[in-house]
Amino acid sequence: MAAMMASITSELLFFLPFILLALLTFYTTTVAKCHGGHWWRGGTTPAKRKRMNLPPGAAGWPLVGETFGYLRAHPATSVGRFMEQHIARYGKIYRSSLFGERTVVSADAGLNRYILQNEGRLFECSYPRSIGGILGKWSMLVLVGDPHREMRAISLNFLSSVRLRAVLLPEVERHTLLVLRAWPPSSTFSAQHQAKKFTFNLMAKNIMSMDPGEEETERLRREYITFMKGVVSAPLNLPGTPYWKALKSRAAILGVIERKMEERVEKLSKEDASVEQDDLLGWALKQSNLSKEQILDLLLSLLFAGHETSSMALALAIFFLEGCPKAVQELREEHLGIARRQRLRGECKLSWEDYKEMVFTQCVINETLRLGNVVRFLHRKVIKDVHYKGYDIPSGWKILPVLAAVHLDSSLYEDPQRFNPWRWKSSGSSGGLAQSSSFMPYGGGTRLCAGSELAKLEMAVFLHHLVLNFRWELAEPDQAFVFPFVDFPKGLPIRVHRIAQDDEQE
């Protein structure tokens, strides 16, 4: 544990000058524009300030506010010392200064739902400009209003329940088996790396029909790794910085997508049905009026969204299950039953009916998402003055609904830091309704993750084949940390042992 924290701390210290410079740059271009020196009060008139009842809180240090405390590394199964101390002192709704902006932080389940349900009316998505700079201005993550609705509609149509059943389920199973069958017996490797390999290859295939293992696919994956390092770095476009390297990788990735697009347009112009490919690129070209730039950003952002969060959720499931043999046993029994029914039908591939029978598997998935919190918080901006639970939240302020704080709230979840998938077995049990209404791993409202059903399908199918074919344990101690996104410092090294087929069929 100490070694992991030391490693993370040294990484934080390495990036500290870049973060400080970025914040100072942001301050000189944005925060300093606030008039009258009353930026903490939102630039309101003296009369209005007297009437406002802002949430309690503190501004922190000049320029940087409380950003470093908020971003301090901590275990993923906790909210961190900063949040714990602020909630204990100020309550679940408090004000702060984060990322160079006046901010309200919400650990309140009701307010978080209120924020997500009032997207476009009282609040709107507001990520740092650097995210738009690297993902693209047409990325669904940063778009608001009608452009976002149009992009989301395309994604939802492509990920419809019909396509999930007929196209994506077989693809998910095929890519799962490609990964698992390559594992040598009694071998040791990074589970996080394998999860990333699985989800990346799946998304590359379904976005642009790129096959796993091919040189072009591997080259794209290497560029994507560099790209991801820049997404979570300080936005300094200087030679040698992670952000600068990420922008170069972005250009290389877009170059691949553009070449694929040109090839596809040429094929479509010849109306050659034999070469038609049922992927998102073809869908966007045929089913929408998007511009070339919009399609490029759409495909890049979905490659990002469909790969990063799903792979981390899968790695977390492997980690949590390793520490809960009882859950592994119940999971294996559920999937042995499904496998037996497959054999009786004379089938060897999963059907949609098989997937719907994975009841305990869904409990494991829910508990993994609740405890691991891949998406910790969301960036929103207040676009109209809001009054909630006696507090005034001024227009123009940032507001961060912290999903992790609600998922780890002891008033909503009994023993919240314990992995307990059985808590999801019955919605009629004590606290069932409160759990379901406060459980928001994929966001909510009009910005509910378009790929949430695909993400759950990926986890369920992978776990099906994993528990039927392997036993595993940690090869060395590791734990998921938040810095600022969830990651395993050592990549989650595991040792796997293949289960004999005779044992599987008992």
UniProtKB/Swiss-Prot annotation:
Task: Cite the entry's keywords alphabetically.
Answer: Brassinosteroid biosynthesis, Heme, Iron, Lipid biosynthesis, Lipid metabolism, Membrane, Metal-binding, Monooxygenase, Oxidoreductase, Steroid biosynthesis, Transmembrane, Transmembrane helix
Q: What kind of membrane protein is this, topologically? A: Single-pass membrane protein
Please list the tissues where expression of this protein has been recorded: Highly expressed in roots and leaf blades. Expressed in shoot apex, stems, leaf sheaths, inflorescences and flowers.
Q: Which GO terms describe its cellular component?
A: endoplasmic reticulum; membrane
Subcellular localization = Membrane
User: Which Gene Ontology molecular function entries are recorded, alphabetically?
Assistant: fatty acid 2-hydroxylase activity; heme binding; iron ion binding; monooxygenase activity; steroid 22S-hydroxylase activity
Q: What processes in GO biological process is this protein linked to? A: brassinosteroid biosynthetic process; brassinosteroid homeostasis; jasmonic acid mediated signaling pathway; leaf development; leaf shaping; response to brassinosteroid; unidimensional cell growth
The enzyme class is oxidoreductase
Enumerate the PANTHER family for this protein: CYTOCHROME P450 26 (PTHR24286), STEROID (22S)-HYDROXYLASE (PTHR24286:SF194)
Name of this chain's protein: Steroid (22S)-hydroxylase
User: What is the taxonomic lineage of the source species?
Assistant: Eukaryota, Viridiplantae, Streptophyta, Embryophyta, Tracheophyta
